[in-house]
Amino acid sequence: PTALTKVAALAAMLAGLIYIVIQFIHPADVVESLTTPMWTIVHVLSFAEAVLVMIGLAGIYLRQVREFRVLGLIAYAMFGFFFILQAAFNFAEAFIAPLIAVDAPQLAVDIVGLFGRYPAVNDLGPLAALPQVGAVLYVGGALLFGVSIIRARVLSRGAGILLIVAAVITPIAGALLPHALERMAAIPMGLGIIWLGLSLWMDQRKTTAN
C-alpha cells in the first residue's frame, strides 16, 4: 500500500539522519558518562534509529522482493537482524547500564565498551562475542543488500553502491583508526540509508502518477 511504503521511506531517511548525527554527539564509553543525560539521549536516539531502519528495510525489501530473490532475502535477514541486536543493545545501554554503573561500574564499562574494542575486565560470557557477530551481520548484510539493490534495478543503484562502499570502509576504519574516528565510517552508511529511503519515496510517487 502507498501509505505504508511512504512510512517506510520516511523511516529510512530519518534513521539515516539520526545515525549520522549521533556519531558527533556520542559520549565517551567511560563510567562517568553513563549517568549523564547526554548518554541516555544518545542511546534512546540510537534505539529509535535501529527501529526506524528495520521499518525502512522492510519497505525497501518488499518493494523489490521478486527482483531480490534468494540473495536479497539473505541480505535482508542479515542486515535486519543486526539492527534487532542493535536495538536490544542500545536499550540496555540507555536504561540498564546507568543502573549497573552505581554498584558495579567496571561491569557497566565492560558492557558498553564492547563495540569500542576496550578489553573487558569481567567475564562477559557469550555477550563477549556480540561485536564479532554484529560485524558479520552489519558488514555482510550491507554488502549483500547493496549488491541486491544493484541487481534488482528497481531503486537507485547509486544507493546500492554507497552501501557497498560503506560496508568495505567499516572494517578498514576499525583496523586503522581509534574508536572516536572509527565512528565516522558510519556516515556513508547513514547517507546510503537516506538515499534508499529517498529512492523508495520517489519510486512510490512515480508509480502512483503512472
Regions found by a protein language model. Give the residues of each.
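Hydrophobic, aromatic-enriched alpha-helical segments typical of multi-pass transmembrane helices
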Residues: P1-N210
